[in-house]
Swiss-Prot record:
The keyword Cytoplasm applies. GO terms for cellular component: cytosol. Keywords: Cytoplasm. Its main location: cytoplasm. GO terms for molecular function: ferric iron binding. It comes from the Bacteria. The keyword Cytoplasm applies. This is Protein FdhE homolog. One of its GO terms (biological process) is protein maturation. It is found in: Cytoplasm. Belongs to the FdhE family. Gene3D superfamilies: FdhE-like domain (3.90.1670.10).
Length: 301
Protein backbone atom coordinates (compact mmCIF):
# COMPACT_ATOMS: atom_id res chain seq x y z
CA UNK A 1 0.00 0.00 0.00
CA UNK A 2 1.35 3.41 -0.91
CA UNK A 3 1.03 6.68 0.98
CA UNK A 4 -2.69 7.42 1.03
CA UNK A 5 -4.19 10.90 0.85
CA UNK A 6 -7.56 10.68 2.58
CA UNK A 7 -10.34 13.31 2.48
CA UNK A 8 -10.66 15.19 5.73
CA UNK A 9 -14.07 15.63 7.30
CA UNK A 10 -14.97 19.34 7.54
CA UNK A 11 -15.47 18.90 11.29
CA UNK A 12 -11.93 17.59 11.73
CA UNK A 13 -9.14 19.93 12.66
CA UNK A 14 -5.82 18.61 11.39
CA UNK A 15 -4.58 15.05 11.17
CA UNK A 16 -6.04 12.30 13.36
CA UNK A 17 -2.51 11.45 14.43
CA UNK A 18 0.78 13.25 14.14
CA UNK A 19 3.69 11.22 12.79
CA UNK A 20 7.20 11.94 13.96
CA UNK A 21 8.24 12.08 10.31
CA UNK A 22 5.61 13.59 7.99
CA UNK A 23 5.11 11.05 5.17
CA UNK A 24 4.30 13.75 2.62
CA UNK A 25 5.24 17.38 2.06
CA UNK A 26 3.01 19.28 -0.36
CA UNK A 27 4.66 21.93 -2.56
CA UNK A 28 5.33 25.39 -1.19
CA UNK A 29 5.14 27.45 -4.33
CA UNK A 30 6.24 30.84 -3.04
CA UNK A 31 9.54 31.63 -4.80
CA UNK A 32 10.13 27.93 -5.54
CA UNK A 33 10.90 28.46 -9.21
CA UNK A 34 12.96 31.59 -8.58
CA UNK A 35 15.06 29.66 -6.04
CA UNK A 36 15.60 26.97 -8.64
CA UNK A 37 16.61 29.56 -11.23
CA UNK A 38 19.08 31.17 -8.82
CA UNK A 39 20.65 27.82 -7.99
CA UNK A 40 20.96 26.92 -11.68
CA UNK A 41 22.77 30.20 -12.37
CA UNK A 42 25.05 29.68 -9.39
CA UNK A 43 25.98 26.17 -10.53
CA UNK A 44 26.46 27.30 -14.13
CA UNK A 45 29.43 29.48 -13.21
CA UNK A 46 31.88 26.57 -12.88
CA UNK A 47 30.14 23.84 -14.85
CA UNK A 48 31.03 22.54 -18.33
CA UNK A 49 27.28 22.50 -19.03
CA UNK A 50 26.94 26.11 -17.91
CA UNK A 51 25.11 27.27 -21.03
CA UNK A 52 22.40 24.67 -20.61
CA UNK A 53 22.06 25.38 -16.89
CA UNK A 54 21.55 29.05 -17.71
CA UNK A 55 18.98 28.06 -20.35
CA UNK A 56 17.11 26.02 -17.72
CA UNK A 57 17.32 28.99 -15.34
CA UNK A 58 15.55 31.19 -17.89
CA UNK A 59 12.71 28.66 -18.07
CA UNK A 60 12.47 28.39 -14.28
CA UNK A 61 12.32 32.19 -13.95
CA UNK A 62 9.53 32.29 -16.52
CA UNK A 63 7.67 29.58 -14.58
CA UNK A 64 7.73 31.81 -11.49
CA UNK A 65 6.12 34.66 -13.43
CA UNK A 66 3.51 32.48 -15.13
CA UNK A 67 2.64 30.79 -11.82
CA UNK A 68 1.53 34.09 -10.29
CA UNK A 69 0.00 35.53 -13.44
CA UNK A 70 -2.36 32.55 -13.78
CA UNK A 71 -3.61 31.38 -10.38
CA UNK A 72 -5.69 28.21 -10.29
CA UNK A 73 -9.07 28.07 -8.61
CA UNK A 74 -10.49 24.62 -8.01
CA UNK A 75 -11.89 22.50 -5.21
CA UNK A 76 -9.87 19.28 -4.93
CA UNK A 77 -12.35 17.47 -2.68
CA UNK A 78 -13.98 15.49 -5.51
CA UNK A 79 -10.57 14.27 -6.62
CA UNK A 80 -9.68 13.34 -3.04
CA UNK A 81 -12.89 11.35 -2.64
CA UNK A 82 -12.29 9.51 -5.91
CA UNK A 83 -8.72 8.83 -4.84
CA UNK A 84 -9.92 7.31 -1.55
CA UNK A 85 -12.30 5.01 -3.45
CA UNK A 86 -9.85 3.92 -6.14
CA UNK A 87 -6.59 3.92 -4.20
CA UNK A 88 -4.97 5.95 -6.97
CA UNK A 89 -3.19 9.30 -6.45
CA UNK A 90 -5.67 12.21 -6.39
CA UNK A 91 -3.88 13.97 -9.26
CA UNK A 92 -3.00 10.79 -11.14
CA UNK A 93 -1.29 11.70 -14.42
CA UNK A 94 -2.81 8.65 -16.11
CA UNK A 95 -6.45 9.36 -15.26
CA UNK A 96 -6.89 13.04 -14.35
CA UNK A 97 -8.51 14.97 -17.23
CA UNK A 98 -6.46 18.01 -18.21
CA UNK A 99 -8.46 21.18 -18.70
CA UNK A 100 -7.53 24.24 -20.77
CA UNK A 101 -5.63 25.82 -17.88
CA UNK A 102 -2.38 24.00 -18.64
CA UNK A 103 -2.39 25.17 -22.26
CA UNK A 104 -2.97 28.75 -21.13
CA UNK A 105 0.06 28.31 -18.90
CA UNK A 106 2.07 27.00 -21.85
CA UNK A 107 1.17 29.91 -24.13
CA UNK A 108 1.93 32.39 -21.37
CA UNK A 109 5.26 30.64 -20.81
CA UNK A 110 6.07 30.86 -24.51
CA UNK A 111 5.26 34.57 -24.57
CA UNK A 112 7.45 35.13 -21.53
CA UNK A 113 10.37 33.17 -22.99
CA UNK A 114 10.45 34.32 -26.61
CA UNK A 115 12.25 37.64 -25.96
CA UNK A 116 15.07 35.72 -24.23
CA UNK A 117 15.44 32.99 -26.85
CA UNK A 118 17.19 32.82 -30.20
CA UNK A 119 18.17 30.26 -32.81
CA UNK A 120 16.87 26.72 -32.38
CA UNK A 121 15.18 27.43 -29.03
CA UNK A 122 13.17 30.30 -30.54
CA UNK A 123 12.16 28.11 -33.49
CA UNK A 124 10.92 25.44 -31.08
CA UNK A 125 8.83 27.98 -29.18
CA UNK A 126 7.33 29.36 -32.39
CA UNK A 127 6.49 25.84 -33.51
CA UNK A 128 4.80 25.08 -30.20
CA UNK A 129 2.93 28.37 -30.41
CA UNK A 130 1.41 27.26 -33.72
CA UNK A 131 0.48 23.79 -32.49
CA UNK A 132 -3.21 23.01 -32.15
CA UNK A 133 -4.84 22.15 -28.85
CA UNK A 134 -5.20 18.55 -30.00
CA UNK A 135 -1.50 18.36 -30.88
CA UNK A 136 -0.49 19.79 -27.51
CA UNK A 137 -2.74 17.31 -25.70
CA UNK A 138 -1.20 14.46 -27.66
CA UNK A 139 2.30 15.56 -26.67
CA UNK A 140 1.32 15.88 -23.00
CA UNK A 141 -0.25 12.43 -23.07
CA UNK A 142 2.84 10.93 -24.67
CA UNK A 143 5.12 12.41 -21.99
CA UNK A 144 2.89 11.10 -19.21
CA UNK A 145 2.89 7.65 -20.86
CA UNK A 146 6.71 7.62 -21.13
CA UNK A 147 6.40 7.57 -24.92
CA UNK A 148 9.25 10.02 -25.24
CA UNK A 149 9.94 9.14 -28.87
CA UNK A 150 6.61 10.80 -29.74
CA UNK A 151 7.79 14.22 -28.52
CA UNK A 152 11.01 15.84 -29.66
CA UNK A 153 13.45 16.32 -26.80
CA UNK A 154 13.70 20.05 -27.53
CA UNK A 155 9.93 20.55 -27.11
CA UNK A 156 9.50 18.33 -24.06
CA UNK A 157 11.04 20.68 -21.44
CA UNK A 158 8.69 23.52 -22.40
CA UNK A 159 5.59 21.32 -22.35
CA UNK A 160 6.62 19.76 -19.06
CA UNK A 161 7.32 23.19 -17.56
CA UNK A 162 3.69 24.20 -18.15
CA UNK A 163 2.33 20.86 -16.94
CA UNK A 164 4.47 21.13 -13.83
CA UNK A 165 3.04 24.53 -12.93
CA UNK A 166 -0.49 23.15 -13.39
CA UNK A 167 0.10 20.05 -11.26
CA UNK A 168 1.98 21.99 -8.59
CA UNK A 169 -0.89 24.48 -8.37
CA UNK A 170 -3.36 21.62 -7.88
CA UNK A 171 -1.17 19.87 -5.32
CA UNK A 172 -0.78 23.08 -3.32
CA UNK A 173 -4.57 23.20 -2.86
CA UNK A 174 -4.75 19.84 -1.04
CA UNK A 175 -3.31 20.70 2.43
CA UNK A 176 -6.09 21.27 4.95
CA UNK A 177 -8.53 19.16 2.94
CA UNK A 178 -6.93 15.76 3.52
CA UNK A 179 -4.68 13.86 5.86
CA UNK A 180 -1.97 11.43 4.91
CA UNK A 181 -1.66 7.78 5.90
CA UNK A 182 1.75 6.15 5.56
CA UNK A 183 2.25 2.98 3.56
CA UNK A 184 4.72 1.17 1.32
CA UNK A 185 5.59 1.02 -2.41
CA UNK A 186 6.75 4.58 -2.63
CA UNK A 187 8.67 4.68 -5.90
CA UNK A 188 5.96 6.90 -7.43
CA UNK A 189 4.65 10.23 -6.18
CA UNK A 190 1.56 9.63 -4.00
CA UNK A 191 0.07 12.93 -5.19
CA UNK A 192 0.32 12.54 -8.97
CA UNK A 193 1.94 9.20 -9.75
CA UNK A 194 4.98 10.66 -11.52
CA UNK A 195 8.57 9.70 -10.73
CA UNK A 196 11.10 11.54 -8.58
CA UNK A 197 13.84 13.74 -9.95
CA UNK A 198 16.16 13.10 -6.99
CA UNK A 199 16.11 12.46 -3.27
CA UNK A 200 16.68 15.19 -0.71
CA UNK A 201 18.44 14.31 2.53
CA UNK A 202 17.17 17.03 4.86
CA UNK A 203 19.35 18.56 7.56
CA UNK A 204 17.83 16.18 10.13
CA UNK A 205 18.92 13.21 8.00
CA UNK A 206 15.42 12.29 6.81
CA UNK A 207 15.13 11.34 3.14
CA UNK A 208 12.37 12.60 0.85
CA UNK A 209 11.93 11.92 -2.85
CA UNK A 210 11.14 15.08 -4.84
CA UNK A 211 8.47 14.75 -7.56
CA UNK A 212 9.59 15.84 -11.01
CA UNK A 213 6.08 17.10 -11.85
CA UNK A 214 4.01 18.41 -8.92
CA UNK A 215 6.98 19.37 -6.67
CA UNK A 216 5.66 17.35 -3.70
CA UNK A 217 8.08 15.36 -1.55
CA UNK A 218 7.41 11.99 0.09
CA UNK A 219 9.34 10.11 2.73
CA UNK A 220 11.18 6.88 1.99
CA UNK A 221 13.18 5.16 4.72
CA UNK A 222 16.88 5.67 4.12
CA UNK A 223 17.72 1.97 4.48
CA UNK A 224 15.56 0.99 1.49
CA UNK A 225 16.02 1.21 -2.25
CA UNK A 226 13.78 4.04 -3.41
CA UNK A 227 12.72 1.98 -6.43
CA UNK A 228 12.20 -1.61 -5.24
CA UNK A 229 12.35 -1.17 -1.44
CA UNK A 230 14.96 -3.88 -0.96
CA UNK A 231 17.46 -3.27 1.82
CA UNK A 232 20.44 -5.30 0.61
CA UNK A 233 23.12 -4.49 -1.95
CA UNK A 234 22.77 -0.70 -1.69
CA UNK A 235 25.85 1.37 -2.51
CA UNK A 236 26.64 5.09 -2.57
CA UNK A 237 28.78 6.66 -5.29
CA UNK A 238 30.29 10.13 -5.52
CA UNK A 239 32.77 12.05 -7.64
CA UNK A 240 33.86 15.55 -6.69
CA UNK A 241 30.67 16.79 -5.02
CA UNK A 242 30.29 15.92 -1.34
CA UNK A 243 26.71 17.20 -1.41
CA UNK A 244 25.61 14.95 -4.28
CA UNK A 245 25.86 11.16 -4.34
CA UNK A 246 24.21 8.37 -6.27
CA UNK A 247 22.57 5.40 -4.56
CA UNK A 248 22.58 2.17 -6.56
CA UNK A 249 20.62 -1.00 -5.93
CA UNK A 250 22.02 -4.34 -7.02
CA UNK A 251 18.59 -5.97 -6.74
CA UNK A 252 16.70 -3.88 -9.30
CA UNK A 253 19.70 -2.39 -11.11
CA UNK A 254 18.64 1.24 -10.73
CA UNK A 255 20.10 4.35 -9.13
CA UNK A 256 18.92 7.73 -7.81
CA UNK A 257 20.81 10.82 -6.69
CA UNK A 258 20.96 11.88 -3.06
CA UNK A 259 21.33 15.60 -2.30
CA UNK A 260 22.57 16.44 1.20
CA UNK A 261 21.33 19.70 2.74
CA UNK A 262 23.76 19.22 5.62
CA UNK A 263 26.69 19.39 3.17
CA UNK A 264 25.23 22.30 1.20
CA UNK A 265 22.03 24.02 2.41
CA UNK A 266 21.50 25.47 -1.08
CA UNK A 267 21.08 22.12 -2.87
CA UNK A 268 17.96 22.06 -5.05
CA UNK A 269 16.29 18.91 -6.33
CA UNK A 270 16.23 19.76 -10.03
CA UNK A 271 19.20 22.12 -10.35
CA UNK A 272 21.80 20.00 -8.56
CA UNK A 273 20.65 16.88 -10.37
CA UNK A 274 21.08 18.61 -13.74
CA UNK A 275 24.46 20.03 -12.79
CA UNK A 276 25.97 16.63 -11.97
CA UNK A 277 25.44 14.73 -15.23
CA UNK A 278 29.00 13.44 -15.02
CA UNK A 279 27.72 11.22 -12.22
CA UNK A 280 24.97 9.97 -14.54
CA UNK A 281 27.62 8.92 -17.05
CA UNK A 282 29.55 7.05 -14.37
CA UNK A 283 26.46 5.16 -13.22
CA UNK A 284 25.65 4.21 -16.80
CA UNK A 285 29.19 2.88 -17.18
CA UNK A 286 28.61 0.76 -14.08
CA UNK A 287 25.52 -0.75 -15.70
CA UNK A 288 22.80 0.91 -13.61
CA UNK A 289 19.61 2.47 -15.01
CA UNK A 290 18.35 5.82 -13.77
CA UNK A 291 15.02 5.51 -11.91
CA UNK A 292 14.25 9.24 -12.12
CA UNK A 293 13.64 11.92 -14.73
CA UNK A 294 14.84 15.51 -14.78
CA UNK A 295 12.28 17.96 -16.24
CA UNK A 296 15.02 19.62 -18.29
CA UNK A 297 16.51 16.42 -19.65
CA UNK A 298 14.26 14.06 -21.59
CA UNK A 299 15.36 10.97 -23.55
CA UNK A 300 16.03 11.69 -27.22
CA UNK A 301 13.93 10.53 -30.11
Amino acid sequence: MTILIIPQDPSENGNPAVDTIPPLLFPRLKNSYSRRAARLRQLAAKNPLGDYLRFAAVIASAQEIVLYDHPLRMDPRARLEESARSGRPPLDINTLPRDAHWQRLLHSLIAELKPDMSGQALSVLENLEKSSSVELEAMAGALFSNEFSQVSSDKAPFIWAALSIYWAQMAALIPGKAYVKAGEQRQFCPVCGSVPVSSMIHVDGVRYLHCNLCESEWHVADAKCSNCEQTRDLHHWSLDSAAVKAESCGDCGTWLKRLYQEKDPAVEAVADDLATLILDARMEQEGFARSSLNPFLFPGE
